[in-house]
């Protein structure tokens, strides 16, 4: 699902809100989440999951085009850990 599809679906389900209001709310929520992670804080949405930063240590990588070794610096990357309720709902899906 894309952000546009999410906005469309929520606007349809919440008839009292316009698509522009839903879009504004989604954009603000995502901006606040990004700002929170950027400051190094953790985000927890009970039942859904938590977002945090994990540190990736420096390592030697490889340039796929040339095959030569490249030294990669350590960095923080976003990490999502699903909550119990979300895991149970996904586990119940029969693919």
Swiss-Prot record:
InterPro entries per record: Hist_DNA-bd (IPR000119), Histone-like_DNA-bd_CS (IPR020816), IHF-like_DNA-bd_dom_sf (IPR010992), IHF_beta (IPR005685)
Protein name: Integration host factor subunit beta
GO cellular component: chromosome; cytosol
UniProt keyword list: DNA recombination, DNA-binding, Transcription, Transcription regulation, Translation regulation
Disulfide bonds: none
Gene: ihfB
Physiological role: This protein is one of the two subunits of integration host factor, a specific DNA-binding protein that functions in genetic recombination as well as in transcriptional and translational control.
Residue stretches in coiled coil: none
Quaternary structure, from the entry: Heterodimer of an alpha and a beta chain.
Family: Belongs to the bacterial histone-like protein family.
A GO biological process held by the record: DNA recombination
Alphabetized GO MF terms: DNA binding; structural constituent of chromatin
